[in-house]
């Protein structure tokens, strides 16, 4: 009845479908929100009585279907053929702005939609307006909850099966997917991803544009512009110290070390893994350095471009236990 009424009104030209109500919504906006897909199709200029796919899609685009979590509409849109290597430009879909359809599905924990998009041709390596892959966006969800583990691992497998190249840059800093996962290792999704990627042959020594390895990113690696203030009293940043590490990070470090992580690699500013560990936090730093020692002989006297050793950084942070530990090898 509602559809027939809407059709007659449109045919009679009694209203302008682009008119807005007092809160700025068009008839199509309301049809989208209320799930009136046949009316939505009609308002978008389609004929839902003769076109089955348009009746299901309701005039929605792929981002709108994801926003309203309408799987029937999404399926119809995909069956009708749609470009999936694109980004959302709709200001109304604020949480999707600038993201790809796959990234939108992953960031909203819509595993079913993510898999359908992948099977329909979404490119896992496509980068959005901020040069992030869908995986990079997904990591920022910082998922917790062990009940999600199998779902996450299933999606990681789907990404691989659908052409994902995790060794490719996943962001504008040139980080691989493993490096980004290491940055998010304080959360279960990051931990699961690190283990999965290493088990599937990820390069544990791949460096980003700053020369940071996955292990360095695990221990607080972050973007740094290299700026050092002229006066020591002025605030400054460092390439390390990007996250507060804990004793639990040693488990992930061990995974990287067992896979052959280079313990003497240096970033573009001369910092080694020991510099990063010393700059990360006081929790677990001593244990992490001890673990590194178990896998080789790192150069504890290595100095960065500012002339600092890991011991110097530990001293600046008043990490007494790490200072005492490093002095044994000085």
Predicted feature locations:
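Intrinsically disordered, low-complexity regulatory segments in ankyrin-centric signaling systems
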Residues: 41-80, 96-99, 107, 115, ...
């Amino acid at each position: 009845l509602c559809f027939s009424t809407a059709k007659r009104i449109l045919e009679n030209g009694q209203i302008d479908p682009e008119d807005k109500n007092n809160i700025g919504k068009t008839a199509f906006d309301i049809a989208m929100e209320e799930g009136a897909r046949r009316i939505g199709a009609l308002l978008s200029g389609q004929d839902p009585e003769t076109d089955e796919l348009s009746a299901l899609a309701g005039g929605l685009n792929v981002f709108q279907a994801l926003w309203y979590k309408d799987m029937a509409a999404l399926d119809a849109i995909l069956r009708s053929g749609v470009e999936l290597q694109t980004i959302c430009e709709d200001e109304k879909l604020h949480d999707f702005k600038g993201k790809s359809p796959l990234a939108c599905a992953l960031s909203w924990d819509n595993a079913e939609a993510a898999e359908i998009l992948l099977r329909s041709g979404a490119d896992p390596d496509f980068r959005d307006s901020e040069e992030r892959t869908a995986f990079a966006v997904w990591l920022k969800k910082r998922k917790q909850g062990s009940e999600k583990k199998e779902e996450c691992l299933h999606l990681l497998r789907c990404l691989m099966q659908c052409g994902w190249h995790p060794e490719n840059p996943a962001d504008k800093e040139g980080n691989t997917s493993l490096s980004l996962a290491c940055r998010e290792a304080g959360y279960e999704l990051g931990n699961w991803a690190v283990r999965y990627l290493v088990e599937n042959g990820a390069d544990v020594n791949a460096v980003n544009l700053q020369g940071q390895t996955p292990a360095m990113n695990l221990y607080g690696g972050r973007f740094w512009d290299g700026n050092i203030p002229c006066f020591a009293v002025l605030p400054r940043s460092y390439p390390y110290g990007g996250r507060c590490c804990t004793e639990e990070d040693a488990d992930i470090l061990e995974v990287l070390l067992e896979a052959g992580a280079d313990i003497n690699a240096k970033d573009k500013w001369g910092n080694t893994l020991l510099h990063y560990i010393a700059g990360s936090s006081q929790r677990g730093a001593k244990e992490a350095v001890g673990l590194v020692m178990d896998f080789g002989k790192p150069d504890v006297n290595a100095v960065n471009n500012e002339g600092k050793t890991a011991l110097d950084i530990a001293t600046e942070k008043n990490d007494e236990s790490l200072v005492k530990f490093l002095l044994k090898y000085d």
